[in-house]
Amino acid sequence: MTLRELILLCKNGFPDGALGLARNLFEQFIIISVFEAQCEGVDRDRMVEKYYADYNVQRYKNLNTMCRYAGQKEKMQDYENELAKLRKQFSVSKLKDYWWSGHYSFTDMCEYVIEHTDGNYKTMVINLYFAYKRACCSLHASNFGNANRLGNCLATIDLSPLDEGQEYALDLAIKSFIMVVAVMYRELGMDYKKSNKKLNQLATFYQSITQKE
């Protein structure tokens, strides 16, 4: 669904929105890669358990914030208690956004994945991470990001509503999507060769466009 939305945004001349979705696919790629790098057995099972528990962590944290600003102190305390139970259950002192992975931030997760890869694949992950950081700079509400969205040629990535700039989002998205699809096909016991070939052809095509600039 994310990739379909991304393609529609590119088709209609909105590469900035597409780049935002490409970032999401890269984040999914990193999350899957962390699980892939984790050894099989008890440790990995525990990580999966934490990942699913994070649903309630994020829910309680958001409800807690809503209650705080609504002046509902009793409900706020109830959510604090639920979060305390989860901290105790999983023996963690803080429930950061990526606590379940054992890393404090998304950057730490990226570095972990890079450290656990080698050869050409490692080079690809590093390049994707650079593209991700570049996308973040382009989309954040900073002076650079705002100028970029207006189509400032000095920003190097044209994200104004034109025919240009689509390739950056598509390149990052497809390369990230390849890993997501590969793991999904494997877990479902499906043959991945045909889809892998087509996705790699797309990745090569988009990469060739970005390299011409």
Task: Name what the model sees in each region.
Residues 50-213:
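Secondary-shell segments that build the walls of catalytic and ion/ligand-binding clefts
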